[in-house]
Regions:
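Conserved helicase core region in the C-terminal RecA-like lobe
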Residues: 107-115, 257-260, 285, 401-403, ...
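P-loop NTPase Walker
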Residues: 2-127, 247, 329-332, 699, ...
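ATPase/helicase motor core of nucleic-acid motors
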Residues: 112, 309, 353-359, 386-520, ...
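Conserved RecA-like helicase ATPase core segment
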Residues: 2-12, 20, 26, 64, ...
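Helicase P-loop NTPase motor core
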Residues: 45-58, 72, 311-313, 318-418, ...
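C-terminal accessory regions
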Residues: 471-472, 633-642, 664-808
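Accessory C-terminal helicase-associated subdomains
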Residues: 206, 484-649, 670, 736, ...
Length: 809
């Protein structure tokens, strides 16, 4: 590394760099981090293993660029999550005493590329046949479109729906949805993808996929909509087919920074290349050991392709600031078993100072119920040792599939321990919220058949069968539903007609005010109409309150940031007049009520509001954004709750204590449909990604890591004998504690298996596993032959903690 090529700060700058904790901001960095930050005169790739401070490096680099006179509007910073984007922005704000950071193009791939598409709406209209009010369909809307198509092309889907086998039908739908996403993320024509032997479309035929894809694309186009994958696809097609537009963004972006580069797919790689100017600088930060999203199209090879294309200088961050030395050593030993993995030298920051040995605990259990009991007991034990250090939010239970969560949820609920299942149900998927959004979509887009169908399905239940026939007829004649219902003829005593006319009158009255009012006004009117016309379900009021909070937050956020960049990098005040200092600009004052009737110079419109909602795609994003913007905890953020989540959902998070559960063969690595028919190369590639997944899980832990597995597990309707994962055998034994492992050798496992078979264990355990699913109240059958594994409600943690003798203390 040539130190003389590291740029030193310019003496002349209009930006003030804040001192943090009495130190210069660069003194907050390690020598490795500082070198990576100060390299700004060429492209670079930063290898940043788990816990090595990659977010800090990226944010300090942005601050360093601006401090060296780089225009904020010429910096593009791309992330994969809103959480990462918000964290980066808040850290840059801490570093720089200047308001111009709002000019930085910082956000997720989808939010930035959607902005580019919106700014080039004329091209989008001409080439993609979508007018300027085009909608973005989320996964739920995408599924609704596919439901209209699949019966025509997939016989088994139609059969499963007729048998009312919802799960089987849903699995088919999600499988097709995934194939469509992967096709779009390749940036190639559908025929080209399905003809590629390496592109898996099993169990479907090429013609099926081609016809479904084209039909789906046409239905989106007819509804003036695109899905999430289209945001990337259309950006790629626009930039690759229009040199003038591509040149505009090449001229604009001098520096491009990309977080989690190992997760990029083909189309993201190509878009970045299209907006990269010849002498521009790209900084990619990533870790090939954390590439775990191949099912979304991410390609670990992109790291190698980046090096070949841009000849970057490589920087390696080798110190883990998150985890103990045992966790770091164990994770490193594991990942070295991957053949196609870069070699690493990674150490813990506490390697020299750590006095107490804290090995990773391996715990085996009789079955998944016993596993859940042991995990929760250990959580209680750790919490009681130090309640301040170990609040409930410092614990995480990580699993490979969502199905594994149930026994832990039952146990936590019975023990009265607060918990949160992450990524289970999106706030935006709730029926009442889908309904409100559908009304808003219809207001700006009469072509949106899907939204109108949802409105009738959710609101007009009494006439759903009649409307289904009308809509089916409209589909065949390719008519818009809105036109159809406007032309309905009344019949004698027709309540249906009266309801529909009332609905049409309401929608038309709102349309007349679209240019005069902001989204929060329409949200309130829609809620009033729904309340007056239809019945509400229990819990809807709370959801509506949260939606109102979100509408208020997004509106105020918009008006607090009116001064923005245009695409040429120039500042543009969007108001009709210059009203600097006007009280219409709301300066992060969340508690100030918004008057929906107030006339503003600049209107936040429904289209922008819907874009913002769709890009806040998780409950955590919504809550975090509202609370961060307000400066208060307007909405409880579930911070003091035990977190249950898949390993995929845990990416980017950290916890004091992590329990990785169900670490058995068939789950680690995960078996999947058609795996036995795969080539050796594909099976090996799959196993390497599964190993990376296990690496990600281990490196979420800061202090304590527990790896658990069960000897028997309920799979479908059968109880299967299970063996611990081969990955456990790949860990560094020196740093493992096997005292909780009942059977820690293959020989003992075979003896255990034999004893179970001799005792006719399958019959004995049928009733043991017969506990019912539950909602709010636990309801399961006790096994007459065994003591109940789960404590009664009267033995909950809160109840016992009040007793003089608490057995868990």
């Amino acid at each position: 590394m040539n130190s003389d090529r590291i740029v030193t700060p310019k003496s002349e700058t209009n930006f003030t760099l804040n001192n943090l904790n009495g130190f210069s901001y660069l003194e907050q960095l390690s020598p490795e981090q500082k070198d990576a930050v100060k390299c700004i005169d060429r492209s670079q790739i930063i290898s940043a293993p788990a816990g090595s401070g990659k977010t800090r490096v990226l944010t300090y680099k942005i601050a360093y660029l601006i401090a060296n006179g780089v225009k904020p509007s010429s910096i593009l910073a791309l992330t994969f999550t809103n959480k990462a984007a918000n964290e980066m922005k808040s850290r840059v704000i801490e570093l720089l005493d200047n308001n111009s950071i709002n000019e930085i193009w910082m956000g997720t791939f989808h939010s930035i590329f959607l902005r580019i598409l919106r700014n080039n709406s004329e091209y989008v209209s001409t080439k993609f046949k979508l007018n300027q009010h085009f909608l973005i369909y989320d996964q739920k809307a995408k599924n609704a479109v596919l439901e209209l198509i699949l019966e025509k092309y997939i016989k088994t889907y139609k059969e499963e729906k007729q048998k009312d086998n919802r799960k089987a039908a849903q699995d088919i739908l999600l499988g097709i949805s995934n194939i469509i996403s992967r096709i779009k993320n390749e940036g190639k024509k559908v025929q080209e993808c399905v003809s590629d032997e390496s592109f898996d479309i099993r169990p479907y035929k090429k013609d099926q996929i081609i016809n479904i894809y084209k039909d789906y694309r046409n239905k989106l186009q007819n509804s003036n909509a695109m899905d999430f994958d289209d945001i990337l696809l259309y950006t790629f097609l626009m930039l690759s087919n229009n040199k003038e537009i591509a040149q505009k963004y090449q001229n604009l972006f001098e520096y491009i920074l990309i977080d989690e580069y190992q997760d990029t797919n083909s189309i993201q790689f190509n878009i970045i290349d299209l907006i990269h100017r010849k002498n521009g600088k790209i900084c990619a930060v990533g870790d090939d050991a954390q590439c775990i999203y191949s099912f979304r199209g991410s390609k670990i090879e992109n790291i190698q392709k980046f090096s070949e294309k841009y000849s970057p200088t490589e920087y390696k961050l080798s110190i883990n600031y998150r985890s103990t030395k045992e966790i770091v050593k164990v994770a490193n030993k594991l990942i070295l078993n991957n053949e196609h993995q870069s070699k690493r030298i990674e150490t813990s920051k506490d390697e020299q100072n750590q006095l107490i040995e804290n090995k990773i605990k391996i715990i085996s259990s009789e079955d998944e119920k016993d596993e859940a009991r042991k995990v929760i007991e250990k959580i209680i034990e750790l919490r009681n040792k130090d309640i301040i250090e170990n609040d409930w939010g410092s614990f995480a239970i990580l699993y490979r599939t969502h199905k594994q969560a149930e026994p832990f949820e039952i146990q936590l609920k019975n023990m009265d321990i607060p918990y949160k299942i992450m990524g289970k149900i999106s706030f935006l998927d709730n029926k009442i919220i889908v309904l409100i959004i559908s009304y808003l979509r219809l207001l700006i887009n009469e072509k949106d058949n899907i939204s109108l169908q949802k409105i009738f399905s959710f609101s007009f239940n009494c006439i759903s069968s009649k409307m289904k026939k009308i809509f089916d007829k409209a589909d065949k004649s390719q008519e818009y539903y809105w036109n159809v219902i406007n032309n309905l003829k009344p019949s004698k005593n027709d309540n249906t007609y009266i309801l529909i006319k009332k609905f049409i009158t309401f929608i038309n009255s709102l349309k007349e005010q679209i240019t005069m009012k902001e989204p929060i006004y329409f949200v309130e009117k829609i809620i009033e109409f729904i309340k007056s016309s239809f019945s509400f379900n229990e819990g809807d009021e709370d959801l509506i309150s949260l939606f109102n909070n979100m509408a208020e937050f997004l509106t105020q956020k918009y008006h607090s940031n009116l001064r923005i960049n245009d695409d040429d990098g120039s500042k543009e005040n969007k108001s009709k007049d210059n009203f600097e200092g006007s009280d219409l600009i709301l300066q992060n004052n969340f508690n100030e009520d918004i008057d929906p009737n107030k006339s503003l110079f600049v209107k936040y419109n429904i289209k922008e509001f819907l874009d913002d909602i769709i890009l806040l795609n998780t409950n955590e994003d919504i809550i975090e954004n509202i609370n961060n913007f307000s400066g208060n905890e307007i909405i409880p953020n579930n911070s003091n709750k035990v977190k249950l989540m898949t390993i995929h959902s845990s990416k980017g998070l950290e916890f004091n204590s992590v329990f990785i559960v169900g670490v058995e063969e068939h789950l680690y690595p995960l078996s999947y449909y058609g795996m036995k028919d795969e080539t050796e190369e594909k099976r090996k590639k799959h196993e390497e990604e599964e190993r990376r997944m296990f690496y990600v899980a281990i490196t979420r832990a800061k202090q304590n890591c527990f790896i658990t597995y069960a000897h028997k597990r309920l799979t479908g309707k059968n109880v299967m004998i299970r063996k611990k994962s081969k990955f456990i055998g790949e860990l560094e034994n020196k740093y493992l504690d096997f005292s909780g492992d009942i059977i820690n050798s293959n020989e003992n496992f075979l003896q255990f298996k034999k004893s179970l078979l001799n005792n006719n264990w399958n019959n004995n355990f049928n009733s043991f596993y017969n506990y019912k699913s539950y909602s709010h109240n636990i309801n399961y059958n006790k096994d007459k032959n065994k003591n109940e594994s789960f404590p009664k409600k009267s033995n909950s943690y809160n109840f016992l903690n009040k007793k003089r003798y608490n057995p868990f203390k």
